[in-house]
């Protein structure tokens, strides 16, 4: 069952004063969420969207819930600065049959990464670092990296895209042609811990229970690179962007968790976004089927920019709406419009591969995938739209052309549900 919420202060919904009752299936109870400032709301038709067509989001989510592929979801859409859709679907806890709630807290996994992208570009704007800076400028251990190549042929340096980690092929090491840069890490073109030959032959550093970015990131320099820096796109899921987070700490003089809280979460009113979910909020976490150990995890001191956050649909809608607004929300300018374009522009030509295949029509910016040609890419998003997702199924994106922000919160990575949500959002645009 899907529920459209009427919430005081927008805990994630469309305000009653802005929506005709006939347009809504209203559920109770009304939830009071304290927010520094509510996201504005509107009737979909007032911002060029169709109420009837937006209901297809609910139909699509329910279909995937009925199939057993997802347990539930929260979906949110804003256009032209106004929230037009915020809906809960399915169950927050399957075993207890607890319905999904508007303020449910989800594990964001790699949906954390665009937060780092914004944090880094804040320091670029302040002149404290440059994307083309070598990593060794801040962390000297990365000064002289090596690249793994196949042993044969001897007259060519070939770095395979993927290898069997348990039985890597015969290989040799060659010096990196140049140092890896912040740009390389933000675009996943560094070759650091990205699943190739170098990763297979490298010993993963052991992380202690009291590890921090400061203690762990220098150890990453022990990795052998998977390919020459800048020559390929290959996703570094858990290492590369943590290096950038450590640079943010060094340059700003502030721990990464405090930096993003003070500079991003607090100004945007993202009050439910945490590396460690506070005790009084743990009951709001989605109970993921077959992953009950999430609730038993001890607090961490390792604030991973690659995948450490938990958050809500409303909080991520605030983040995406800031990007739609050219770096501004509630009169608070986090980035300039030009810098937002830097974040969401393709920096790689045709290097982007989308994990397992060439992704024609797509590119990659700073921590986000970018639609270049939606027809060629088979994407329902507009040219210029950018965003990213997480391993548990979360997705969010910004569409500057349509002035649209969309958030899908899942805890099962099911691509048909992700596609159907994006399709339902785009087909609801009528002006």
Predicted feature descriptions by range:
Residues 55-62, 81-86, 106-135, 143, ...:
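Active-site SXXK
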Residues 244, 395-397, 403-412:
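Short, well-ordered beta-strand elements
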Residues 35, 41-108, 128-130, 144-152, ...:
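Short, conserved catalytic-motif segment at the N-terminal edge
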Residues 24, 30-38, 93, 134-383:
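Short, surface-exposed loop or secondary-structure junction motifs
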Residues 9-17:
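Hydrophobic h-region of N-terminal signal peptides that target proteins for export
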Residues 1-7:
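Short amphipathic, positively biased membrane-proximal segments
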Residues 67-69, 98-100, 130, 173-180, ...:
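Extracellular/periplasmic catalytic domains that process cell-envelope and extracellular macromolecules
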Residues 50, 113, 312:
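Short, conserved phosphate/pyrophosphate- and ester-handling motifs at nucleotide-, phospho-/glycolipid
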């Amino acid at each position: 069952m899907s529920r459209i919420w009427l919430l005081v202060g927008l805990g994630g919904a469309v305000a009653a004063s802005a929506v005709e009752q006939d347009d809504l299936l209203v559920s109770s109870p009304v939830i009071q969420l304290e927010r520094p400032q509510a996201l504005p709301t509107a009737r979909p038709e007032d911002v060029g969207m169709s109420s009837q067509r937006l209901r297809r989001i609910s139909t699509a989510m329910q279909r995937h819930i009925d199939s057993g592929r997802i347990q539930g979801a929260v979906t949110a859409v804003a256009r032209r600065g106004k929230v037009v859709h915020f809906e809960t679907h399915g169950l927050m806890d399957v075993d207890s049959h607890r319905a999904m709630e508007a303020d449910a807290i989800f594990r964001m996994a790699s949906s954390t990464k665009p937060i780092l992208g914004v944090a880094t570009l804040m320091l670029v704007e302040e002149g404290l670092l440059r994307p083309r800076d070598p990593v060794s400028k801040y962390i000297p251990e990365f000064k002289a990296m090596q690249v793994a190549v196949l042993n044969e042929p001897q007259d060519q340096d070939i770095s395979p895209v993927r290898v069997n980690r348990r039985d890597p092929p015969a290989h040799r090491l060659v010096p990196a042609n140049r140092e890896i840069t912040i740009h390389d890490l933000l675009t996943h073109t560094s070759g650091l811990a990205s699943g190739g030959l170098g990763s297979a032959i490298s010993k993963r550093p052991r992380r202690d229970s009291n590890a921090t970015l400061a203690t762990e990131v220098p150890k990453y320099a022990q990795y052998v690179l998977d390919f020459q820096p800048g020559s390929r796109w290959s996703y570094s899921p858990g290492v590369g962007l943590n290096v950038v987070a450590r640079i943010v700490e060094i340059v700003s003089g502030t721990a990464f968790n405090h930096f993003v809280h003070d500079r991003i979460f607090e100004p945007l009113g993202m009050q439910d976004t945490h590396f460690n979910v506070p005790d009084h909020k743990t009951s709001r976490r989605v109970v993921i089927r077959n992953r009950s150990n999430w609730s038993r995890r001890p607090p961490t001191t390792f604030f991973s920019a690659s995948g450490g956050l938990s958050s809500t649909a409303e909080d991520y809608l605030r983040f995406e709406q800031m990007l739609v607004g050219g770096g501004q929300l509630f009169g608070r300018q986090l980035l300039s419009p030009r810098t937002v374009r830097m974040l969401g522009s393709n920096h790689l030509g045709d290097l982007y591969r989308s994990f397992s295949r060439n992704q024609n029509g797509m590119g990659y910016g700073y921590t986000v995938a970018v639609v270049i040609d939606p027809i060629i890419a088979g994407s329902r998003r507009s040219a210029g739209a950018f965003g990213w997702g997480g391993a548990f199924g979360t997705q969010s994106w910004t569409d500057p052309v349509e002035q649209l922000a969309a958030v899908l919160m899942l805890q099962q990575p099911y691509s048909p549900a992700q596609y159907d949500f994006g399709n339902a959002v785009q087909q609801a645009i009528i002006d």
